[in-house]
From Swiss-Prot:
It is found in: Periplasm. The keyword Oxidoreductase applies. Binds 1 PQQ group per subunit. PQQ is inserted between disulfide Cys-138-Cys-139 and the plane of Trp-266. Binds 1 Ca(2+) ion per subunit. It holds the Pfam family PQQ. Its cofactor is pyrroloquinoline quinone; Ca(2+); heme c. GO terms for cellular component: membrane; periplasmic space. This is Quinohemoprotein alcohol dehydrogenase ADH-IIG. Belongs to the bacterial PQQ dehydrogenase family. Ca(2+) binds at E207, N284, D329.
Amino acid sequence: MRQTGLASLPLKSLAVAVLLSLAGTPALAADIPANVDGARIIAADKEPGNWMSTGRTYDEQRYSPLKQISDQNVGQLGLAWSYKLDLDRGVEATPIVVDGAMYTTGPFSVVYALDARDGRLIWKYDPQSDRHRAGEACCDAVNRGVAVWKGKVYVGVLDGRLEAIDAKTGQRAWSVDTRADHKRSYTITGAPRVVNGKVVIGNGGAEFGVRGYVTAYDAETGKEAWRFYTVPGDPKLPPEGKGMEIAAKTWFGDAYVEQGGGGTAWDSFAYDPELNLLYIGVGNGSLWDPKWRSQAKGDNLFLSSIVAVNADTGEYVWHYQTTPGDAWDYTATQHMILAELPIDGKPRKVLMQAPKNGFFYVIDRATGELLSAKGIVPQSWTKGMDMKTGRPILDEENAAYWKNGKRNLVTPAFWGAHDWQPMSYNPDTGLVYIPAHIMSAYYEHIPEAPKRNPFKSMYQLGLRTGMMPEGAEGLLEMAKSWSGKLIAWDPVKQQAAWEVPYVTIFNGGTLSTAGNLVFEGSADGRVIAYAADTGEKLWEQPAASGVMAAPVTYSVDGEQYVTFMAGWGGAFSTFAGALSLRAGVQPYAQVLTYKLGGTAKLQEPAPRPDTPKPPALSNDTASIEAGAKLYDGYCSQCHGIHAVSGGVLPDLRKLTPEKHQMFLGILFGGRVPDGMPSFADAFTPEQVDQIHQYLIKRAHDLHQEGDTWKQFSAKSSH
């Protein structure tokens, strides 16, 4: 049942929650389920059986003191239970576990409350996300999880709402629309954090042209407490606070006002209770090309920056910019970890981050001073770090595409050396465990200033990037050039202690434990445990799908469990579908929970249907070429470049005869339950036919190249 309005609802209303078998469930064992507050999170080590915040603790270390499962017995792990999610798309959530109840999310921000002992559903809450707006999300209809506080569960909804749910009943308590401008493509995929009674959430949308900000809301009522903008607005208007006074001086011209400027804080936060500082990871610019965004001038603060603000007021305190004047989608939204490290023989309270640009940063978290920075993967865009200025040294010949007149092959590329998949820190080993990428892509300046496209589901990048060969052999060669690895990084020595290779990128986030273990899922469909000190693989089982999310561990009734959220999807398998086929998996979304001696059976997806024979190929090459351009501009971000899908959304080369007959109706009518908008305002019937003819041509290519496509899947031997 759809809920409307922003007011609190009566408790007797069930919203869209499903209540099952409430009597005797662990969620009701406590007087108030999910009864978490700041003091409890700060003292989390006193109750290590719970996982009460996204990173377990405010320092976001993703380290658990539990050690019933250890390097001595992890080989005895077996599946304890599984729970099948409703929709097979990308799964990125970190579950929250409190007092025997698990709270997690699936695609389109659906929230599940499960019995952490056996996976029984307690309730399910569907926020009825406006699914036709899924095309306004850059990277699939994903969600990275919830927050809990004093009996409420908080979720950011894909369409821009923040909602509070009663943890006992699954009913909506309040809802707020976080969007500052409904004409812009704002979305939410990140997990909220709750600090000092305030729910903090950012947003996504920089690829579509928005202005980024972070907002804090009263956890009890949903009333806005403060908002911090990450990039300046109209220079004709007064700046919003000290932060924007500083930032405005680093932007030039006024093109960014129409473009939005970007700087969305779509994922990472951390909090230091002693300093009362909230750390915000800020994203890329709108547009990507700095010439069209800011006349190729200025640092464009606070793009690609870590910003510290007062947690109570949202007032600016300090910033450190990882990539001044970002031009490559080198966000600083990646996971931040707070720790105390020995630096030059003295203990320092630091913030650590491995953002997309390939450096690993150690920063004084009180002042923002850069203490050290080293590259964790090959970097063609920079010649190193100037420690006197704290700025990377740009390699203009190999990366400054907006002024060197070249199509530059840049490493790392837009999904970075490390993306949203969380890293973890183990204070016992002193190592940070990073799910890293090795990838390159072309960036090319366009000679004319781009005009904003009014169609809200269209990328607004201001350059050419992501170019790939069309033929299967060229795509296979490119796919083999992208790889992943798990890096155990020593943040004091700034060097790798050990590494484990993977066949492709987008492997899962990591969890480390006092049992000398590191857990990680892989893109090619495995869940794995390594020895935290040496990297030796100690345990592995199939996961029935790719695993991108970070696992958690908890205990109930004295028994330790490890949970992975499995489900292939996200940006890699949509936009770069052909390259993602290296993983050799299909989307199959489920919660997988393991314990010592577990004997449950893994659920597997059904085999894919055979590829239909395509209709007759048109000899109208002009229409096919026109259709290719339209497809590239409007369709590739979801269905894949060159119409090669990674399997999360339909591969349009494999349409059935019925779908070919319905093609015009599908594009003009949309498929809202699946997240596909109507394109009636974007295309004429003639243009739809051109796209259709192009897809038929690509279907014929598929049949001719069939043997090569069979070589794409390459499961890792590790």
